[in-house]
């Protein structure tokens, strides 16, 4: 089972809000996930990225790989701190 850190879409039509979740790579985009490690709200100005660093490091230590989109969000979040 390959585990990925990726985005799941929430919100309503034309008003997206995303969760950063840890999920099996074969699960559906908005399907079953293992843990929530953060949120991303692109509709705010500037966009709001909230990450639980403790959970994130725990999952990365276990071998979870972030998607390219999540990697770029993590870089932006680190730059804003």
Curated annotation (Swiss-Prot):
One example of a Gene Ontology biological process annotation: translation
Protein name per Swiss-Prot or TrEMBL: Small ribosomal subunit protein bS16
Gene name in the database record: rpsP
InterPro entries the UniProt entry points to: Ribosomal_bS16 (IPR000307), Ribosomal_bS16_CS (IPR020592), Ribosomal_bS16_dom_sf (IPR023803)
Annotated organism of origin: Desulfotalea psychrophila (strain LSv54 / DSM 12343)
UniProt xrefs under PANTHER family: 30S RIBOSOMAL PROTEIN S16, SMALL RIBOSOMAL SUBUNIT PROTEIN BS16M
Family: Belongs to the bacterial ribosomal protein bS16 family.
Keywords recorded for this protein, A-Z: Ribonucleoprotein, Ribosomal protein
Any one cellular-component term (Gene Ontology): cytoplasm
Gene3D superfamilies assigned: 3.30.1320.10
């Amino acid at each position: 089972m390959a585990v990925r850190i990726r985005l799941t879409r929430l919100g309503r039509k034309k008003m997206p809000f995303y969760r950063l979740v840890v999920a099996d790579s074969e699960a559906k985009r908005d399907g079953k996930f293992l843990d929530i490690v953060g949120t991303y709200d692109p509709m705010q100005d500037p966009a709001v990225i909230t990450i639980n660093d403790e959970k994130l490091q725990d999952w990365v230590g276990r071998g979870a790989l972030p998607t390219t989109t999540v990697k770029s969000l993590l870089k932006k979040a680190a730059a804003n701190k």
